[in-house]
Amino acid sequence: MGNYYSRRKSRKHITTVALIILLLLLFLFLYAKASSSSPNIHHHSTHGSLKKSGNLDPKLHDLDSNAASSRGSKYTNYEGGGEDVFEDGKRRVFTGPNPLHNR
């Protein structure tokens, strides 16, 4: 009966060692893959895959900043004679109700 327990112990030991080696190889593979692709993440993120906001929402495309300032919007300074607060070179910021505050 002593041989049965010693053989069972050696199989369990071999299985444990094999599992540890497989986990170590998996960890090394994932680490090597992550470290080799980290410079490429920055390269691909600035490649120009983002779309302009006008293409995403057709309502924003129809808005004209000159028409909004001529009829008086929140972007004009009423005390200064209707002078635009934001210059034409700056991006347009459309404000509205914040959906995160609707409770």
Curated annotation (Swiss-Prot):
<feature type="region of interest" description="Disordered">
    <location>
        <begin position="37"/>
        <end position="103"/>
    </location>
</feature>
<comment type="similarity">
    <text>Belongs to the CLV3/ESR signal peptide family.</text>
</comment>
<keyword id="KW-0325">Glycoprotein</keyword>
<feature type="compositionally biased region" description="Polar residues">
    <location>
        <begin position="66"/>
        <end position="76"/>
    </location>
</feature>
<feature type="compositionally biased region" description="Basic residues">
    <location>
        <begin position="41"/>
        <end position="50"/>
    </location>
</feature>
<dbReference type="GO" id="GO:0033612">
    <property type="term" value="F:receptor serine/threonine kinase binding"/>
</dbReference>
<feature type="signal peptide">
    <location>
        <begin position="1"/>
        <end position="34"/>
    </location>
</feature>
<dbReference type="GO" id="GO:0048364">
    <property type="term" value="P:root development"/>
</dbReference>
<keyword id="KW-0964">Secreted</keyword>
<feature type="modified residue" description="Hydroxyproline">
    <location>
        <position position="97"/>
    </location>
</feature>
<dbReference type="GO" id="GO:0045168">
    <property type="term" value="P:cell-cell signaling involved in cell fate commitment"/>
</dbReference>
<dbReference type="GO" id="GO:0048046">
    <property type="term" value="C:apoplast"/>
</dbReference>
<feature type="glycosylation site" description="O-linked (Ara...) hydroxyproline">
    <location>
        <position position="97"/>
    </location>
</feature>
<keyword id="KW-0221">Differentiation</keyword>
<dbReference type="GO" id="GO:0010087">
    <property type="term" value="P:phloem or xylem histogenesis"/>
</dbReference>
<dbReference type="GO" id="GO:0010078">
    <property type="term" value="P:maintenance of root meristem identity"/>
</dbReference>
<protein>
    <recommendedName>
        <fullName>CLAVATA3/ESR (CLE)-related protein 22</fullName>
    </recommendedName>
</protein>
<keyword id="KW-0379">Hydroxylation</keyword>
<keyword id="KW-0217">Developmental protein</keyword>
<keyword id="KW-0732">Signal</keyword>
<dbReference type="InterPro" id="IPR033249">
    <property type="entry name" value="CLE_plant"/>
</dbReference>
